[in-house]
């Protein structure tokens, strides 16, 4: 029963991380753009 109460309180505890979770899926796109910019900087060797 205590585990159920703990799980019920978890969403409230993680509410501050909601903006972070919204940004997380975009991070791989940033890596892709970074790789493209890096290749452009070295002249597409």
Swiss-Prot record:
Q: Specify the superkingdom.
A: Bacteria
* Keyword terms of this UniProt record: Membrane, Photosynthesis, Photosystem II, Reaction center, Thylakoid, Transmembrane, Transmembrane helix
User: Which GO terms fall under biological process for this protein?
Assistant: photosynthesis
Q: Which Pfam families match?
A: PsbK (PF02533)
InterPro entries attached here?
PSII_PsbK, PSII_PsbK_sf
Q: Which residues form the propeptide?
A: 1-8
Q: Which GO terms describe its cellular component?
A: photosystem II reaction center; plasma membrane-derived thylakoid membrane
Q: How does it sit in the membrane?
A: Single-pass membrane protein
Q: Where in the cell is it found?
A: Cellular thylakoid membrane
Q: Which residues cross the membrane?
A: 24-44
Q: What is its main location?
A: membrane
Q: Does the keyword Iron-sulfur apply?
A: no
Q: Which family does it belong to?
A: Belongs to the PsbK family.
Q: What does this protein do?
A: One of the components of the core complex of photosystem II (PSII). PSII is a light-driven water:plastoquinone oxidoreductase that uses light energy to abstract electrons from H(2)O, generating O(2) and a proton gradient subsequently used for ATP formation. It consists of a core antenna complex that captures photons, and an electron transfer chain that converts photonic excitation into a charge separation.
Query: What is the designated name of this protein?
Result: Photosystem II reaction center protein K
Organism whose genome encodes this protein: Nostoc sp. (strain PCC 7120 / SAG 25.82 / UTEX 2576)
């Amino acid at each position: 029963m205590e585990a159920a109460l703990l799980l019920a309180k978890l969403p409230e505890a993680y509410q501050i991380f909601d903006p972070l979770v919204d940004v997380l899926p975009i991070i791989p796109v940033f890596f892709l753009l970074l790789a493209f910019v890096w290749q452009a900087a070295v002249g597409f060797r």
